[in-house]
Amino acid sequence: MNINNPDIVVRHIKTKNKTRKIITYRSEDCELKTKHRRINTFLQERFIPSIFTKGYVKGRSIYDNALPHMYNDYFILLDIKDFFPHICHKQLAAKIFHEINLVKENQINKKECNYIVDCCSIGSRGLPLGFITSPILSNMYLKEFDCILYGYLKKMELNNVIYTRYADDIIISFKTDSFVEFKEIENNIVDTSKLLLSKYGLQINNRKTRAYNLDISNHVRITGINITKSE
């Protein structure tokens, strides 16, 4: 879709570290938002979200993202750099086709998938922050990633390993008795996450990568929720 669509309004919101470009709708009842509501309903009725994603899913919240980790001692927090703007349209269309036809075949064809991507995006790459369709499409995009990364973590045979994702925030926690072992595990997990994300055209934001050992730091903050070390 072209940025000059009359139903689109572009706003620039200043945050602490940068200015975000928010693309939203001219009005609640404009043609584009009405169209997006229909697309959203169609997708929500047919898409089964990853069990690991806690953001943008009805009935899940920041608490559901943090609480599964509360009994672990070691935490690795990763951030996907500029997640929405770097979503690949070709891959997204393929994932829509796969996910919508997963439970029941012939729910959607490839031409319709390409139409959804074109209708819900601006330019040749990414999803706009501000479109009501972007959250569910972003979860479709990373559902496969969630499952592959968790499978890798399970193969590492970590004690009580937990993985969750809230939009672009990745949280991994586990138990281990050795700090030296923790550093090795941390490096393996970060390297594997980077490699997997690169297949989706995405990168880790190295500045926001964090690792916590509750024996040292005593607490960790996950999507605004504090987890503290129990005595």
Model-assigned labels for residue ranges:
Residues 11-36, 118-139:
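Short, conserved non-catalytic motifs in the polymerase core
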